[in-house]
């Protein structure tokens, strides 16, 4: 639980796959909220958290099953507004005296349309302007009898109690998911709910910046902090925020493994050292990394070699910094949420950046994680608040192992040099056409095959490359970007004409799933 002076909203997670989207929608409304799994939410916890309102998330279980997830019964007497969503609606009805039934005949999955009843309420302000509202349903059980005190304000063909409310107690319940994209007007419901709950909307990145600067100063005192700087958005914003708080008590270590994009090391070190006046150690260990990777073609082996060497190299340079007691990490809120499974135990894989995984334990350092309350879009907003240039804030994701996983098969210096040049041309083309910000991630992969070509009057036998560009919201699913044929033809021509060593260019149109975004 995080200490904050802002009004707080508690989201009780019953296991929905889209619970994070609820938090995202609320943060967009400048409302501070936290997600906590239902089994951790006791009334002692609620009183300590002191929420101004509560939301019950959806979930995969059935309230008709004995032992299924519940909210603390006393929370209904706590005196704050509550919104129940899908399974959260069923929990509310079940615990307050209504009836929930299982039945395939009334299940709804996918798009549905809700129709209002005659009586309108403030919670539905801005809704039903076109008589019906499109929503996204995902329920097998259904409410067959609402709890005492509730009335119906919206219905759908298979959900006669799609929207219900007890206005006296400020309890609201919907059978659909207002947080998802497929409920186009869903954000309006959240706006109405937080307005009715009395939130001031003071959760801004400016306020967060001031609060976190003070928190870092209190945590660190006069001790020193080390930061593994990658040049990515997360580590860059974390470093800038910590530097604002403690100045030269922060030292950044930029490990150059020889697998970076064209001019990347110089740009990252130059920005932080020369323009932001951070202390940056540029650890150029290209020879070490490429030497260990020589002859290796298995992608998992390459990842493990790079990860282990990174830790060894980082520790070597960190040991030279006297008095360092803290390690800075760019942990984000989704990482914190995903590190605990719905059952309350450790998840199968706790997400950790390969660059810093295992470092705190190995080095005996305490963690400074100034971004652990933020989503990715909030990190970008904080970066702008801190004055970082858009060229860094808006960068596409770049994997820790770098170009190693964009070079299937064995890695050689020659292939890396070819790949850097081709990738630089591709990104230049995307920027020239004004497409960079429309794309989640774009890169070139050099393929482990040579193909025959003709250039001038001569025969060539050079590498083929694949262009990759995807659109995505969170990287979990992705679709290829629909470039025009003109763009692809122009880009392929530039790469083949300007990069010695490539004579064939393809465009990867695989979605995720079944493919992954990266080639390895």
From Swiss-Prot:
Residues 203-395 form the GMPS ATP-PPase domain. ATP binds at residues 230-236. GO terms for molecular function: ATP binding; GMP synthase activity. It is an enzyme of class 6 (ligase). Residues 8-202 form the Glutamine amidotransferase type-1 domain. The active site is at residues 86, 177, 179. CDD domains: GATase1_GMP_Synthase, GMP_synthase_C. Its EC number is 6.3.5.2. PROSITE patterns: GATASE_TYPE_1, GMPS_ATP_PPASE. It catalyses: XMP + L-glutamine + ATP + H2O = GMP + L-glutamate + AMP + diphosphate + 2 H(+). Pathway: Purine metabolism; GMP biosynthesis; GMP from XMP (L-Gln route): step 1/1. One of its GO terms (cellular component) is cytosol. The keyword Zinc does not apply. Keywords: ATP-binding, Glutamine amidotransferase, GMP biosynthesis, Ligase, Nucleotide-binding, Purine biosynthesis. HAMAP family: GMP_synthase (MF_00344). Catalyzes the synthesis of GMP from XMP. Homodimer. This is GMP synthase [glutamine-hydrolyzing]. It comes from Ruegeria sp. (strain TM1040).
């Amino acid at each position: 639980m995080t200490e904050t002076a802002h009004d707080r909203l508690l989201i009780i997670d019953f296991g929905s796959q889209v619970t994070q989207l609820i938090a995202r929608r609320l943060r967009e409304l400048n409302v501070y909220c936290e997600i906590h799994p239902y089994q951790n939410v006791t009334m002692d916890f609620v009183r300590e958290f002191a929420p101004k309102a509560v939301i019950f998330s959806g979930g995969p279980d059935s309230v008709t099953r004995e032992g299924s997830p519940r909210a603390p019964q006393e929370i209904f007497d706590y005196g704050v507004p509550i919104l129940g969503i899908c399974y959260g609606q069923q929990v509310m009805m079940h615990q307050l005296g209504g009836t929930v039934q299982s039945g395939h005949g009334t299940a709804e999955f996918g798009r549905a349309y809700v129709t209002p009843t005659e009586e309108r309420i403030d919670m539905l302000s801005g809704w039903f302007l076109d008589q019906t509202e499109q929503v996204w349903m995902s329920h097998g059980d259904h409410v067959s009898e609402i709890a005492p005190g509730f009335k119906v304000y919206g219905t759908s063909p298979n959900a006669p109690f799609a929207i219900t409310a007890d206005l006296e107690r400020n309890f609201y319940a919907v059978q659909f998911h207002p947080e998802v994209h497929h409920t186009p007007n869903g954000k309006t419901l959240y706006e109405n709910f937080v307005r009715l709950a009395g939130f001031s909307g003071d959760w801004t990145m400016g306020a967060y910046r001031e609060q976190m600067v003070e928190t870092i100063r209190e945590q660190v005192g006069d001790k020193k902090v080390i930061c593994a700087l990658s040049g990515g958005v997360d580590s860059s914003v974390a470093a800038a925020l910590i530097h604002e708080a403690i100045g030269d008590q922060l030292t950044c270590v930029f490990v150059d493994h020889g697998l970076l994009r064209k001019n990347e090391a110089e740009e990252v070190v130059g920005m932080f050292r020369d323009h932001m006046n951070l202390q940056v150690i540029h650890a150029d260990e290209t020879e070490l990394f490429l030497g260990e990777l020589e002859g290796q073609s298995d992608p998992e082996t390459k990842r493990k070699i790079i990860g282990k060497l990174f830790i060894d190299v980082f520790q070597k340079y960190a040991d030279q910094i006297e008095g360092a007691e803290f390690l800075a990490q760019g942990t984000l809120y989704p990482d914190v949420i995903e590190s605990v499974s719905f059952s309350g135990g450790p998840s199968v894989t706790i997400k950790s950046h390969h660059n810093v995984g295992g470092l705190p334990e190995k080095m005996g350092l305490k963690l400074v994680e100034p971004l652990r309350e933020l989503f990715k879009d909030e990190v970008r907003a904080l970066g702008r608040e801190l004055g970082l240039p858009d060229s860094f804030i808006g960068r596409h994701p770049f994997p820790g192992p770098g170009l190693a996983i964009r070079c299937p098969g064995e890695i050689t210096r020659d292939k890396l040099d070819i790949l850097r040049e081709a990738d630089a041309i591709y990104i230049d083309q995307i920027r020239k056409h004004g497409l960079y910000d429309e794309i989640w991630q774009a890169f070139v992969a050099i393929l482990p095959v040579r193909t025959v070509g003709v250039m001038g009057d001569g025969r060539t036998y050079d590498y083929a490359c694949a262009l990759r560009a995807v659109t995505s919201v969170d990287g979990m699913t992705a679709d290829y970007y629909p470039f025009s044929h003109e763009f692809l033809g122009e880009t392929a021509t530039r790469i083949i004409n300007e990069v010695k060593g490539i004579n064939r260019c393809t465009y990867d149109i695989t979605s995720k799933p079944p493919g992954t975004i990266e080639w390895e």
